[in-house]
Amino acid sequence: MAFRKENKIKSNFSKISIGLASPEEILENSSGEVLKPETINYRTYKPERDGLFCERIFGPIKDYECHCGKYKRIRYKGIVCDRCGVEVTEKKVRRERMGHIQLVVPVAHIWYFRSLPNKIGYLLGLPTKKLDSIIYYERYVVIQPGVKAEDGIAEFDLLSEEEYLDILDTLPKDNQYLEDTDPNKFIAKMGAEAIYDLLARLDLDALSYELRHRAGNDASQQRKNEALKRLQVVESFRASRGRNKPEWMIVRIVPVIPPELRPLVPLDGGRFATSDLNDLYRRVIIRNNRLKRLIEIKAPEVILRNEKRMLQESVDSLFDNSRKSSAVKTDANRPLKSLSDSLKGKQGRFRQNLLGKRVDYSARSVIVVGPELRMHECGIPKLMAAELYKPFIIRKLIERGIVKTVKSAKKIVDRKEPVIWDILEHVMKGHPVLLNRAPTLHRLGIQAFQPKMIEGKAIQLHPLACTAFNADFDGDQMAVHLPLSNEAVLEAQMLMLASHNILNPANGAPITVPSQDMVLGLYYITKLRKGAKGEGLTFYGPEEALIAYNEGKVDIHAPVKVIVKDLDENGNIVDVMRETSVGRVIVNEIVPPEVGYINTIISKKSLRDIISAVIKACGVARTADFLDGIKNLGYKMAFQGGLSFNLGDIIIPKEKETLVQRGYEEVEQVINNYNMGFITNNERYNQVIDIWTHVNSELSNILMKTISSDDQGFNSVYMMLDSGARGSKEQIRQLSGMRGLMAKPQKAGAEGGQIIENPILSNFKEGLSVLEYFISTHGARKGLADTALKTADAGYLTRRLVDVSHDVIINEEDCGTLRGLVCTDLKNNDEVIATLYERILGRVSVHDIIHPQTGELLVAGGEEITEDIAKKIQESPIESVEIRSVLTCESKKGVCAKCYGRNLATNHMVQKGEAVGVIAAQSIGEPGTQLTLRTFHAGGTAANIAANASIVAKNNARLEFEELRTVDIVDETGEAAKVVVGRLAEVRFIDVNTGIVLSTHNVPYGSTLYVADGEVVEKGKLIAKWDPFNAVIITEATGKIEFEGVIENVTYKIESDEATGLREIIIIESKDKTKVPSAHILTEDGDLIRTYNLPVGGHVVIENGQKVKAGEVIVKIPRAVGKAGDITGGLPRVTELFEARNPSNPAVVSEIDGEVTMGKVKRGNREIIVTSKTGEVKKYLVPLSKQILVQENDYVRAGTPLSDGATTPADILAIKGPTAVQEYIVNEVQDVYRLQGVKINDKHFEIIVRQMMRKVTIDEPGDTRFLEQQVVDKLEFMEENDRIWGKKVVVDAGDSENLKAGQIVTARKLRDENSMLKRRDLKPVEVRDAVAATSTQILQGITRAALQTSSFMSAASFQETTKVLNEAAINGKIDKLEGMKENVICGHLIPAGTGLREFDKIIVGSKEEYDRILANKKTVLDYNEVE
């Protein structure tokens, strides 16, 4: 009898390292060698000995029973049977014991020569093709040339069979009997053995030195890059000193995973269901055994070689079957699932089993509404509760002595005997449950409720909780989970209770806002009706008013006067007389007095503000009660008012006829113009669309007036709309106005929707014609189809966001940074999009802010800007405030509380441990799905806003122009005017008295200007106007036109219009890049004055030889046709920004300030040269197909686009620096969400952008351990530079024995060494200062950033699992388990919130438990103190 050791891993580890396994390690972890390919005996169903399921190796199949049955039962535990060699133990060891297969010949590991970057190839400097031919036994490789070196044969040479045999023939006789270490011996081998020898012979230090030299000195960029790539692999092996050896990439022993992880289950009928891995292992074993036998019988080399190659292939497919070109398939032609495949993807180990586990104590059912529940309650069906709380009931049954054993208690519960209901009531008190609705898009998708037992089988949900869950009662299901431990119960009660989650973490607005019926009821009773019964009465208090109402003396809507409690200016509660209505008095019975008297009509918007005010004034608990009161009142009043609508409430305005008629007339006019040839087809189309858009919006306005004045605004449809209960202006317009313009169906992948120019003139009340109906349905169905497709994209975006930001946690109070972001009002042209108040609220100021007029200190540096302070700042003349931001936070891990500011879900400063990264990701991802789901509500109606085409003075002001260049013309009315020909013209409106700049506008190129610089204008004066449909090119000189390179069907095509017979010249992209269409302007004598390039797509409106005056249009370029604003712009745009992708047509941007000169045309590109005042010259090539936005002699600033197109974030980063690009991304993404009406606080975007900017790339490595072009963490970079700061590098070691050239030493060590040498009169050490590394900030897309995180576990569970693990293993990476994902994977508490490591010592439980623990601790503590 022998005993075996047990080695268990402790679960409280703090880091995980990964590396290559050495053959010794594999042997150490193995419990025995698998020799036979057999699995189990098909008759007895017992495992075969030495096979893949052998009990001797992996442990017994039944608990405490050996194979032959000699030892049974637990008393023989640990004994190894002398007959069958099986250890008597539990059967679960079959889940953890490994075996191994000893291979006859080594094989290469497929991860390290098949996947890119090819590690073995880089180490040996061999290309993949050559490597393959060695590994798969096609070529010999010379490992040591020996005596053949003089014949020009070098190491790493490949030899074919013949060459190899020739060389063997010419070798001296005794050569093959020399020792392998003898430098004269010629050695060449093939297969993985050869690679093994080559890798084992590598001297990494020498190789590293040589490659560094090559990378530093090679002139050719390609060879330099090659050296750098190899260097990275070499350095990673050197860095993991001895933990990883290169030759371990060659496998000599294949580990066999435990049998329970690759089960084999007998089905009925003598068939077996098996894991694919068994097949793969069997092939390896069969081939290995066959090779053994062939070697024993001394088979010819050819046969052996073939068998070796097959062995290599079988091990390849075991490790990674998907990498191979010819994957091993089953009979059903399905590729087998190899070890790598079981890690990858959504169904792989990481995402399926480690990050997403199924849990016990959970239930799921349909939800129904529970209007009588309190805010923190939910209704749980009796049967469900009995099952969920089963163990608790059993415990109580035994405690109360109703039963003696657990078994009998179980029976009672299963039979649902009446005694258990009473116990269940008791157990459920103070033991909340968690409700969750999939998809859980943000943290409000899981909330805790106090359960109430109900009859029936459906879960009851509080109506106000629906918004957060995005639930409705049309058959949605929800899952219930039960928190078990004391800690979990406490967290559920304190942090997750629904009545505590009233605010939305994305923007701080209340999320439990009553909707639909509730809003309608409140709106109805707070609306006033002139001439109602009892109008004008006066009451001495709310009570009297209510009595009068109940007695029927006064109508609920009648305007009356009542003395009520309200707030005065200082916020004290006083009695005042207010003109109000009984309805409003009833509402104010519920409103807490601290908020004052609400004397307005209540809509959904105002309700949200009231709830915010209640939270600020009274705290969360009172707000929950208030919400319950509001809910009850709202439902009651909506029911009492009988607020439904009938067909008569949908009123069609009588002006509709005339409006439509007028539209037709205008369209007729446009078509006439087109037929006469005054306008192009494109212009006609744009104008028609414009006309109908105007008609539609005018009709909408009239409709709104009509419907709102109907029955004093008590029209049911109008009330639903106005209160915000249901419906939108769009929808009502379609019910009783006209459906309007619809989007045109387009082919998949086509850019932006065109609009059908014939509008649908009918509305739904009149009914649509067949054609109209057809167009209508198309839009509606497209909306539904889009939704389904986009939801997946939104989910994937959320996943990437979470992955990039999950390790951002508040880790300290204050990082002490002095930097911040400057915040101002966010404006677009002239209209304020986000006020300074919104942007600084809840942030922390960097400096003291002092009121410029009164000199009072508004807020000290490092203090939170509260509502009051923000209001004061907004009202003062202060334009900008520098605030702390996550983007400038200098915390080493996570971010600090001061830089983050206020936690939006609580309205207090954020606490340490808050998982702000995940909150940010959820806040951005959750509306992503909303964005996508928003398309179809208008039923595919085209939202097209007519472009404005003029600048009109909004105030009386003085004008100042900048960069203005004009030419004088006479416009079509005969007035003198100027045409702007500069691209950078700006006009500033300046207040005549104060000199403050009121607004700035860009004056577009080609606009007609009606004022002069410095002129003072009245409000409403037209400053400039331009053609909204076409971009133009205007001549600045008078003369004769001469075309060059304008050749029919090469650089232009003629489009003749069938309708008008007019012909237009349209420039097309020519295949022949030497032909550049351009127009020269010549003087009378034929001297060249100016040349204009004609851009692709331009319509030429003049003829060759024509005389032109300055200011005339030469070319019109139709602007993109009015596109239907659909979210299709939304989500892809957000993705594009977060992935830092370059847009499809990037603009060419100037990197310096300077003057523009046009260069030659090179290969279809126009050269633009920018010369700065300092004489620096930059050349840019712009494709001729693009319109060039600058002209000869223009002065441009750095960052100005030279051609049309979108600016790329990379350019902004390179030219304007990190801050500019951070603000650009935040603002651009915000724009997309704003367009959809989604409010998200800036700080969430800032967190994501911070994660995108974590890395720098090394320009000059200096004396640091970095390599050129290496991408490293900013922090790591700074630490490494600090490490070598002030140290010296040995240039010449002199006579020193301790130091050698190239070593980095401290000044002190150097001094000691040199003084010692000096005393002994030896040559001193020569040194130079250590050079620090330099770097450039880079911007990474979220996917790249998530894959480059410091934690390999997090990266591997995200994407490209095998590649990440492969890299990590070679680098011998260590995961410190700092983020959330890693800890979830390891089954630890997450390092955020209550899981912060500093809270480890907190114990939640009853007093008795605490005392017991203390008693146990005391003995330990005394012992520790002695130490």
From Swiss-Prot:
Among its keywords, does the record have Methyltransferase? no
Q: What class of enzyme is it?
A: transferase
Instruction: Identify the cofactor(s).
Output: Mg(2+); Zn(2+)
SUPFAM superfamilies for the chain: beta and beta-prime subunits of DNA dependent RNA-polymerase (SSF64484)
Q: Which reaction does it catalyse?
A: RNA(n) + a ribonucleoside 5'-triphosphate = RNA(n+1) + diphosphate
**UniProt keyword annotations, A-Z:** DNA-directed RNA polymerase, Magnesium, Metal-binding, Nucleotidyltransferase, Transcription, Transferase, Zinc
Q: Which GO terms describe its cellular component?
A: DNA-directed RNA polymerase complex
How the cofactor binds, per note? Binds 1 Mg(2+) ion per subunit.
Q: State the EC number(s).
A: 2.7.7.6
Show the InterPro entries listed in the entry: DNA-dir_RpoC_beta_prime, DNA-dir_RpoC_beta_prime_bact, RNA_pol_asu, RNA_pol_N, RNA_pol_Rpb1_1, RNA_pol_Rpb1_3, RNA_pol_Rpb1_3_sf, RNA_pol_Rpb1_4
Record's Pfam families?
RNA_pol_Rpb1_1, RNA_pol_Rpb1_2, RNA_pol_Rpb1_3, RNA_pol_Rpb1_4, RNA_pol_Rpb1_5
Residues binding Mg(2+) are D472, D474, D476
Highest taxon above the source species: Bacteria
GO process annotations (BP) = DNA-templated transcription
Spell out the subunit comment: The RNAP catalytic core consists of 2 alpha, 1 beta, 1 beta' and 1 omega subunit. When a sigma factor is associated with the core the holoenzyme is formed, which can initiate transcription.
**What NCBIfam families does the record point to?**
rpoC_TIGR
Q: What does this protein do?
A: DNA-dependent RNA polymerase catalyzes the transcription of DNA into RNA using the four ribonucleoside triphosphates as substrates.
In the record, the note on similarity to other proteins reads: Belongs to the RNA polymerase beta' chain family.
Protein name as catalogued: DNA-directed RNA polymerase subunit beta'
Q: Which organism is it from?
A: Bacteroides fragilis (strain ATCC 25285 / DSM 2151 / CCUG 4856 / JCM 11019 / LMG 10263 / NCTC 9343 / Onslow / VPI 2553 / EN-2)
Recorded name of the encoding gene: rpoC
